Amino acid sequence: MLHSVQKTDIIQKYAIHDGDTGSPEVQIALLSERINQLQEHFRTHQKDHHSRRGLLKLVSQRRRQLDYLKRVDIERYRSLINRLNLRK
């Protein structure tokens, strides 16, 4: 779970303009951070299958957001992929 300080930092880092919390870049960055935290959780709790389902939901949600951004603006998509160090 993201703490409010972490969430605020991510929002400020990826926001397009002041007060931006809903742009695809911000949403994808927040989802990526939650996914990374869950991956750390699974390093010590391999048998936590309930949380694994939540992880799969987050990954598919991020995939849909990335597909949308790629369809709308390919340059923003490529920039975000590089900034987040995602494979693509």
UniProtKB/Swiss-Prot annotation:
One of the primary rRNA binding proteins, it binds directly to 16S rRNA where it helps nucleate assembly of the platform of the 30S subunit by binding and bridging several RNA helices of the 16S rRNA. Forms an intersubunit bridge (bridge B4) with the 23S rRNA of the 50S subunit in the ribosome. It comes from Sorangium cellulosum (strain So ce56). Disulfide bonds: none annotated. The keyword tRNA-binding does not apply. Belongs to the universal ribosomal protein uS15 family. Keywords: Ribonucleoprotein, Ribosomal protein, RNA-binding, rRNA-binding. Part of the 30S ribosomal subunit. Forms a bridge to the 50S subunit in the 70S ribosome, contacting the 23S rRNA. CDD domains: Ribosomal_S15p_S13e (cd00353). This is Small ribosomal subunit protein uS15. One of its GO terms (molecular function) is rRNA binding. NCBIfam families: S15_bact (TIGR00952). GO terms for biological process: translation. The gene is rpsO. GO terms for cellular component: cytosolic small ribosomal subunit.
